Amino acid sequence: MTDRSTLDDAPAQADFIIAGATLIDGGGGPARQGDLAVRGGRIVALGDFAHAPGVPVIDARGLALAPGFIDSHTHDDGYLLAHPEMLPKVSQGITTVVTGNCGISLAPLSRRQIPQPLDLLGPPELFRFATFRDWLRALAETPAAVNVIPLVGHTTLRVAVMDDTGRAATDAERAAMRALLDEALQAGAFGVSTGTFYPPASAAPTDEIIDVCQPLRGRAGAIYATHLRDEADHIVPAMEEALLIGRELDCRVVFSHHKLAGERNHGRSRETLDMISRAAATQRVCLDCHPYPATSTMLRLDRARLASRTLITWSKGYPEATGRDFSEVMAELGLDDEAAIARLAPAGAIYFLMDQADVNRIFSHPLTTVGSDGLPFDPHPHPRQWGTFTNVLRTMVREQRLLSLETAIHKMTGLAAAQYGLTERGLLRQGYHADLVLFDPANVTDTATFSAPIQVSQGIHAVWVNGRQVWDGERTGAERPGQVLAPGDAIPWSQQSE
């Protein structure tokens, strides 16, 4: 860490200078031309200053420089260990990921038989951490290219403690989950996520969640992120439940991948966003989403029947279905939808469920951040894993002009940092950590599509994490400077002696 007393003699002692860039500071204000100097992983100067002889200078004329993007919703828990170069993320400008969403986290859980949807996080051998601290220690010992904001999953707690997740937890089981959660928070988790949409947690009543999550109460900046029980016909009572839980626990509610699923719910984002705005007047609340009108998760009958189109992303029961339309696979097998799902199971799918007008309206809300919600181990993933952030810059900024460039960057950086309680990140400020992305605003674009989803973005010229370059516009480097971040002003794991 660079001592603050050294800031005044920079940029003469800078490690490098990025010169002539359009500086978009992440706070939502107007862009300006200027230079930025980095030393010891920190921003030590920005604006108009003299360049000392011998300091490397990167010519950024015609390019934009912004804080590194924060992916507010990921399932990268296991991918960080298996693929620490994090190519799908750094190639689109992401420098920090929020893990443990939708109720599923890699830890605390050590077992070989992994039920859906936990298997979305990767193969069974990754589930080897009996405590949250064990997983964080592994990340600190073998760092990835990006920073990590860890959440602990309520579903993971249920699977770790209960012999039957198809019922409410007993008092003893609640106490055991509460103890695991307390350990996770003490180790460095920012909060809890739930996924009561999914069977391992759908039997959990509201009072169980409140009881288990009691360790959140009184923790400054604690997060309660939720994949709602219902994002379709019954979304309003599901949102009311989440807001109640947030009030009872006195913590921030994050509505994950906010959407209105199914044609009969298209247009209802006006109603749900109004609920969020009204709630924000009396409690801490925010939301995230991605720019696509399709979502992805395990293959389910209810989702397939709601969707206008279903695309199979993987299947253990019938691998030949991967990458194909579900309707085509049903015809090939001569089965109806219910029988075909049983034949393909376990499997994953992309569902075309949402209306683009709702997506745009949600994105425009002032409390919305950007979250890819990608499933990195899928053989044929949703393109959001590789292209969410550059898709926003192409479609919502440049083509549709739905958002100004400064507003889009604010949602990707400063707003997300504020909502998750990060200090000295998310903005271009002297003394802040040098998480940076240099890109061409006129040409930046996603190339990942639903038919060919594994493709790097174009127009991202360079990415730095904690002052070290992890992407040069064409390839990742050997650097793995990512840190496991800690809530508030706590010391990040990578700087702890233990």
Swiss-Prot record:
It catalyses: an N-acyl-D-aspartate + H2O = D-aspartate + a carboxylate. It is an enzyme of class 3 (hydrolase). GO terms for cellular component: cytoplasm. Its cofactor is Zn(2+). Transmembrane segments: none annotated. Keywords: Cytoplasm, Hydrolase, Zinc. GO terms for molecular function: N-acyl-D-aspartate deacylase activity. SUPFAM superfamilies: Composite domain of metallo-dependent hydrolases (SSF51338), Metallo-dependent hydrolases (SSF51556). This is N-acyl-D-aspartate deacylase.
